[in-house]
């Protein structure tokens, strides 16, 4: 039974192209929004503060500041609502979950940019 479930999960994950990103990275997520009878793409750009790797049930949390209010949104990685994910900037952090950023504002909430040391990175 579990083999069948794993096989279905693998099929669902196969068609989606997900870039490699980590907490601390700034990403641009294109989300499909349906308004009435038309569909459009809405951009949500922010810092990844958490990532949950669970196969088909994988998710990540993106935080941005909009009009001086912190906005967090949790995206299911393989959801059909998520059209594309683009990594804008790599962040250099030492934590897997960056929940401490919720309590910081302005310059204190900045994340150092990761300098690529290797050619492939």
Curated annotation (Swiss-Prot):
GO molecular function: structural constituent of ribosome
GO BP: any one term: translation
Keyword Nucleotide-binding: no
InterPro entries for the chain: Ribosomal_bL19 (IPR001857), Ribosomal_bL19_CS (IPR018257), Ribosomal_bL19_sf (IPR038657), Translation_prot_SH3-like_sf (IPR008991)
Annotated signal sequence range: none
Keywords (A to Z) from UniProt: Ribonucleoprotein, Ribosomal protein
Recorded GO CC terms: cytosolic large ribosomal subunit
Family: Belongs to the bacterial ribosomal protein bL19 family.
Role summary: This protein is located at the 30S-50S ribosomal subunit interface and may play a role in the structure and function of the aminoacyl-tRNA binding site.
Name of the protein this chain belongs to: Large ribosomal subunit protein bL19
């Amino acid at each position: 039974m579990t083999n069948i479930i794993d096989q279905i999960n693998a099929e669902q994950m196969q068609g989606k192209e997900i870039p490699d990103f980590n907490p601390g990275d700034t990403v641009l997520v294109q989300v499909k929004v349906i308004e009435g009878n038309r569909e459009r793409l809405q951009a949500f750009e922010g810092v990844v503060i958490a990532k949950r790797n669970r196969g088909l049930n994988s998710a990540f949390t993106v935080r941005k500041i909009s009009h001086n209010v912190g906005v967090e949104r949790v995206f299911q990685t393989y959801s059909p609502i998520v059209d594309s994910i683009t990594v804008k900037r790599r962040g250099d952090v030492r934590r897997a979950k960056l929940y401490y950023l919720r309590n910081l504002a302005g310059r204190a909430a900045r994340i150092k940019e990761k300098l690529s040391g290797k050619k492939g990175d």
